[in-house]
């Protein structure tokens, strides 16, 4: 009989490499609410059901129409006349037996009228193709409850996403091109001792050629310090001189030529990395200085408790530095030397994490919580990623839509270029205005397209006037949006479905950094942009 754990590892192999067991566990404990099972909505859920989201609930009061069947792969003609939430749930559940699917045959407006607390239970609410008025109502309820809200929309060849979350903390941000944490400029005692155990001047050739480049750089730094008042090589000229010092250390053969020592070549190549000063990034420093980090209460999340614990470590045992990360890059070296060096860093990281753990324990006790409420594993992970912590704070929809608090500067500066994706945002706001006035979107009926162009132009002008925006929207965009007729082409819905599911997974797992706060995709020009609105 197959071990269920092994079978799960095989099933989710690729994604486990991305976000690990703990990320998968967060996904499997999540309950996502989708409002409206349109083409975009079912595409988003498909991309959450396949990786194994714990549960989903679809809220949709609409019946399946011929139009739905025409653009939605998850609805068949036999479903016409049935409730759309029910029909989509049945087919989506077939994708993954591990996932629990539920549906509510009611409009979000009715739920907001009768039981707005219904939405409090979810890990994330995703609203698709929702009218502006409902979106604002639901946004206010979720903002108050602290539930993350993702608004998605496909409008013709335009894709739109808006993330609304008061505070989202990220421990594992997985940054690209992260610098190694080697501490060669400020070596800790055990590293110093380990480096000193290597005598490069009196070594067999084989050992000399298989000494890790970190050791090579550290030993030659000592020589550099002796000649340069213990100052690190800082500028290009000094670093080039240091590289030359390393080149001179390469062994010579009996003919006086240089031996082929790849470890020294690695050392020369990695001079910039190795000599990067050990310091705390401004982003991490901002987190340490935040009020939430300063004032820990029994309501504080584990992120802020651990941030305070790391800050205490920095101010005391760390002598101004973060806990050692504990990892080193692959390099040319024999296994024994590499493992010994790796263990020096790893052991130091574990000792630092243990000290942070003590700070966290004392902190938890001071606010009346048990030390077990944050596990050792969580603290180790936090210490390992302390240099890459992120906090994302989005503005509320109410602030974005209010004439007093909307982001005028962002809109105006972007509209200096009349074909900026910002014009798509203004057009989406304008078609919503059209809907409020006419209870339909422009161009939905072919015979009204010409007439709707003028009506939509009035809506664009009234929007710009109301918000005192002195910008120009080309007539081409007004014509284009009328031609869209609020259609939801599957190609755009599929792209949006993949993008939105990716952001949803970031929110649920607290890994990778979500966008802040508005994303626009233009399928005509194959471009996209992110704005803070």
Curated annotation (Swiss-Prot):
**Keywords, in A-Z order:** Ubl conjugation pathway
What the entry lists under CDD domains is as follows: APPBP1_RUB
Domain of life assignment: Eukaryota
The GO molecular function terms of this record are: NEDD8 activating enzyme activity
First and last residue of the signal peptide: none
- Any one Gene Ontology BP term: protein neddylation
Please name the pathway: Protein modification; protein neddylation
Region of interest (Interaction with uba3), residue spans: 330-343
InterPro entries given in the database record: APP-BP1, ThiF/MoeB/HesA, ThiF_NAD_FAD-bd, Ubiquitin-activating_enz
Q: Which Pfam family is an annotated match for this chain, by its short name? A: ThiF
Residues the UniProt record annotates as site (Interaction with uba3)? 210
Family per similarity comment: Belongs to the ubiquitin-activating E1 family. ULA1 subfamily.
Functionally, this protein is described as follows: Regulatory subunit of the dimeric uba3-nae1 E1 enzyme. E1 activates nedd8 by first adenylating its C-terminal glycine residue with ATP, thereafter linking this residue to the side chain of the catalytic cysteine, yielding a nedd8-uba3 thioester and free AMP. E1 finally transfers nedd8 to the catalytic cysteine of ube2m. The covalent attachment of nedd8 to target proteins is known as 'neddylation' and the process is involved in the regulation of cell growth, viability and development.
The subunit field of the Swiss-Prot or TrEMBL record says: Heterodimer of uba3 and nae1. The complex binds nedd8 and ube2m.
Name of the protein described by the UniProt record: NEDD8-activating enzyme E1 regulatory subunit
* Organism, scientific name: Danio rerio (Zebrafish)
**GN (gene name):** nae1
């Amino acid at each position: 009989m197959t071990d269920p754990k092994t079978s799960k590892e095989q099933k989710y192999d690729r994604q486990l490499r991305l976000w690990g067991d703990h990320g998968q566990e967060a996904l499997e404990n999540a309950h996502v609410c989708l409002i409206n099972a349109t083409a975009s909505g079912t595409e988003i859920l498909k991309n959450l059901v396949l990786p194994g989201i714990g549960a989903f609930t679809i809220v949709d009061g609409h019946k399946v129409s011929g139009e739905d069947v025409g653009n939605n792969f998850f609805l068949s003609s036999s479903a016409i006349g049935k409730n759309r939430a029910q029909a989509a749930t049945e087919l989506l559940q077939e994708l993954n037996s591990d996932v629990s699917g539920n549906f509510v045959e009611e409009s979000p407006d009715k739920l907001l009228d009768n039981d707005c607390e219904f939405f409090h239970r979810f890990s994330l609410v995703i609203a698709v193709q929702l009218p502006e008025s409902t979106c604002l109502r639901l946004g206010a309820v979720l903002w108050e409850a602290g539930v993350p809200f993702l608004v998605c929309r496909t409008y013709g060849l335009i894709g739109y996403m808006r993330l609304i979350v008061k505070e989202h903390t990220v421990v594992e941000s997985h940054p690209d091109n992260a610098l190694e944490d080697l501490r060669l400029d400020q070596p800790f005692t055990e590293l110093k001792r380990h480096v000193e155990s290597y005598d490069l001047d009196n070594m067999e050739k084989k050992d000399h050629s298989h000494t890790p480049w970190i050791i090579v750089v550290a030993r030659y730094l000592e020589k550099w310090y002796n000649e340069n008042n213990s100052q690190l090589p800082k500028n290009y000229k000094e670093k080039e001189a240091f590289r030359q010092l390393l080149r001179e250390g390469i062994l010579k053969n009996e003919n006086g030529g240089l031996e082929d020592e790849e470890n020294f070549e690695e050392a020369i190549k990695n001079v910039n990395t190795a000599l990067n000063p050990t310091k705390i990034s401004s982003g991490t420093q901002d987190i340490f200085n935040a009020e939430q980090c300063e004032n820990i209460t029994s309501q504080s999340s584990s992120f802020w408790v651990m941030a305070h614990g790391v800050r205490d470590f920095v101010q005391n045992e760390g002598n101004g530095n973060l806990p050692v990360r504990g990892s080193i890059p692959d390099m040319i070296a024999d296994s024994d030397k590499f493992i010994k060096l790796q263990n020096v860093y790893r052991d130091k990281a574990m000792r630092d994490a243990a000290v942070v753990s003590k700070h966290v324990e004392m902190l938890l006790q001071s606010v009346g919580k048990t030390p077990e409420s944050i596990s050792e594993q969580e603290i180790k992970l936090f210490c390992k990623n302390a240099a890459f912590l992120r906090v994302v704070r989005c503005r509320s929809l109410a602030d974005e839509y209010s004439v007093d608090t909307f982001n005028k500067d962002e809109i105006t500066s972007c509209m200096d270029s009349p074909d900026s994706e910002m014009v798509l945002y203004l057009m989406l706001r304008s078609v919503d205005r059209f809907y409020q006035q006419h209870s339909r979107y422009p161009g939905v009926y072919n015979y009204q397209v010409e007439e709707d162009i003028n009506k939509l132009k009035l809506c664009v002008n009234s929007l710009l006037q109301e918000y005192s925006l002195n910008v120009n929207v080309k007539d081409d965009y007004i014509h284009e949006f009328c031609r869209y007729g609020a259609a939801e082409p599957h190609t755009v819905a599929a792209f949006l479905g993949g993008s939105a599911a990716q952001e949803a997974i970031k929110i649920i797992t607290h890994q990778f950094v979500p966008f802040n706060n508005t994303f626009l995709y233009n399928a005509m020009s194959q471009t996209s942009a992110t704005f803070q609105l």
